[in-house]
UniProtKB/Swiss-Prot annotation:
Hydrolase in keyword set: yes
Family: Belongs to the GppA/Ppx family. GppA subfamily.
Enzyme Commission no: 3.6.1.40
Lineage: Bacteria, Pseudomonadati, Pseudomonadota, Gammaproteobacteria, Vibrionales
Top-level enzyme category: hydrolase
Protein name: Guanosine-5'-triphosphate,3'-diphosphate pyrophosphatase
The encoding gene: gppA
Domain of life: Bacteria
Amino acid sequence: MKSSTMSPMYAAIDLGSNSFHMLVVRHINGSVQTMAKIKRKVRLAAGLNENNTLSHEAMQRGWDCLSLFAERLQDIPVENIRIVGTATLRVASNVDIFLEKANQILGHNINVIEGEEEARMIYQGVAHTSGGNGRRLVVDIGGASTELIIGEGFEAQALTSLKMGCVTWLEGYFKDRALTQKNFNAAIAGAKETLAPILQQYTDLGWQTCVGASGTVQALQEIMLAQGMDEVITLAKLKRLQKQAMQYEHLEELDIDGLTLERALVFPSGLSILIAIFELLNIDSMTLAGGALREGLCYGMIDELQHDEVCQRTIKSTQQRYQLDVDYAQQVTDLSIQLVQQCGNDWLIEPQALPLLTAATQLHEIGMCIDYKKGGEHSAYLINALDLPGFTRAQKHLLGELLRRYREYFSAMPTQHAVSDISAQRMLRILRLAIILTHRRDVNLAPTVTLSEKNDVLSLSIDGAWLAANPLTRSELEIEADKQTNIGWELVIDARD
């Protein structure tokens, strides 16, 4: 049976200090689609002794894992494969013994990369999969090293790899497995001491947003969501989780809502490192990145994706995949932007609100690929279910709720954490108006309108003669005015003479 050749496949393998990961993707419609993610907990760093000699047992765990990965690599062109080793393999004195057998198992050579190169590839993975403007701080806490990067767009401006990680900090500060204040204090202090040499450089550069790109950060976010918190990580939430952990005497007893058994062993050490980073760098908040080292390796093999804006690339790929009417989507987008600008540049409070509104206008008909009758419901489902690089979970939730309400179904927006409640309300009002005004799907047939706002009362001024000649649009606008007004969002339709 022939293997599929419909689009090129790529694979990246990361031999981390805590886990080995394999990512398989394909390049399709100008975007990257994940085909497989394989992870095995190897805890390679735990096999290092005081002389940095890797134990045979740890090496065997690694070889056993690579034997599994080798099967999948057989299906992928050699030139589309990247395999890297990180912190533990950088320091292991007997690394050659491990690599000789590992290379034989895989049929490919492993490249042990330096810490700065690891940081560079992590940043590329973040830049290609995470949205946001301005300068950002990226934090990746691994098993034996922690990378911190400041960059903007696709350019990294500061790259650091520090010799601390959740496995090494576990052995260094929680060796007795006691979840005491003393152990936490020592672990946090040790992390701050390790961070101190870079403090001045990083605070001088500064950043607008902070993202975490590691299993540690992902695990913490999952715990917060399981406990009813939002996805934004703050120091107060980290301290809250520390208090929860300290209610248990020993690590083996740890049972926090949302914490998986797989992550429990390195939870206190990873948490301590992140608390130290928050406190020393005075970080307000952190969100989870869409990718890191493995994604950076994959995107680095695909030349045409090197400098595309992430969110726009995602939108374009999704439009192609679901055969959306791109010209009409752009008409709705242009009118939405015009209506927002008429209400004032600061009417949508957060800077990310307008880009999110334009994403909604570009994708609002996606649910119609399933069924017209429940198009909004299907749109919401797809937006939340799809992998959309550049958009956080909270942003996908907001987009889904906007698109659920873009047509017949109408209600106030539910609680969400991507923008303020008032901005979400205003985004929905604009979206619905823009769709009604463009329903003939021809820019030459759309009316000239002026939208004004005072105390959240919207007044839509439109030519009376045009309304008389387009009775369906007039009727839909009148119905929309009633709907918005009935839930407290007053909308007035003003027919100009």
